[in-house]
Amino acid sequence: MMRQSLQAVLPKISGNKTSLLRKSVCSDLLTLFNSPHSALPSLLVSGMPEWQVHNPSDKHLQSWYCRQLRSALLFHEPRIAALQVNLKEAYCHTLAISLEIMLYHDDEPLTFDLVWDNGGWRSATLENVS
């Protein structure tokens, strides 16, 4: 039996609209992470308070954290077509993650880095998103 595949033809988006889309997604993700009533699991948004009760060097915990975060973000952000979550730093008082994002209607990957800092998440890359 021959398998047929359907390909959706997506309209092209101009560079300016792509830049606005990227900034909007990053801004919305940062808001989601810093929301006191976020729909994300507490370990994913609470950062350090929850992270300190675990062994941050535990590779199984790191893998679980990345899988859970990826699943939650894909559920809550419909503009993301593909996502890879990496821990850049995972120490007792430092938690830094990198999100490698592919958006629908965008051919270039988007890297969004987040760091837990003084009780909240901040991004060093939001200003550089284009």
Curated annotation (Swiss-Prot):
Pfam families associated with the record: GPW_gp25 (PF04965)
| Location(s) in or outside the cell | Cytoplasm
Keyword Cytoplasm in the entry? The reply is yes
Q: Which family does it belong to?
A: Belongs to the GpW/Gp25 family. IraD subfamily.
Annotated keywords: Cytoplasm, Stress response
Q: Which domain of life is it from?
A: Bacteria
The protein's GO terms of the molecular function aspect are: anti-sigma factor antagonist activity
Q: What is the source species?
A: Escherichia coli O7:K1 (strain IAI39 / ExPEC)
Matching entries from InterPro entries are given as: Anti-adapt_IraD, IraD/Gp25-like
Name listed for the protein in its UniProt record: Anti-adapter protein IraD
Q: Name one GO cellular component term.
A: cytoplasm
Question: What's the stated role of this polypeptide?
Answer: Inhibits RpoS proteolysis by regulating RssB activity, thereby increasing the stability of the sigma stress factor RpoS during oxidative stress. Its effect on RpoS stability is due to its interaction with RssB, which probably blocks the interaction of RssB with RpoS, and the consequent delivery of the RssB-RpoS complex to the ClpXP protein degradation pathway.
NCBIfam families, alphabetized:
PRK14128.1-1, PRK14128.1-3
Any one of the GO BP annotations: cellular response to oxidative stress
Q: What is its main location?
A: cytoplasm
Its quaternary organisation is:
Interacts with RssB.
